[in-house]
Amino acid sequence: FNGAAPIACNNEHFGKAENILAPGRGINMGDGWETRRSRGKNFDWLIIKCATAAQVNKIQIDTHHFKGNYPDQCSIQASLVKIKPSAKKIVAMSKKWKQLLNKVKLKAHKKHNFRNKLIKKSKINYIKINIFPDGGISRIRLLGKVN
């Protein structure tokens, strides 16, 4: 993610979205991205522009320090966007992006590694992290090949 940047998110109540891209592991809950509690069928999301287009082979999602306030589940959508759209346009486009990682259960205070569950095998340069229903993620890392 060296050079990646958050483009848009729907909620940064307790922790800024940019924290999720910081180096190393989080030092406390405030050093991650955390959304306020929501009820019902809502979910929170964050869109990140990757530093370069690549084929993702592994995803790490770290809920370090998030013990009672980690998301129950998450999914990741992705796309290769060849134009330079506004943040508003990217948000609209993201609703139709394909799944990179189907909805998976998360656990408290743990580094989750997903390799075999990845769906999309082509190049991407944007991701959308969906967390269900809300909560905090300390870090996210994408590992793969730049072609």
Predicted regions and their residues:
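Trp- and acidic/polar-enriched beta-sheet ligand-binding modules for extracellular glycan
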Residues: 1-45, 55, 65-147
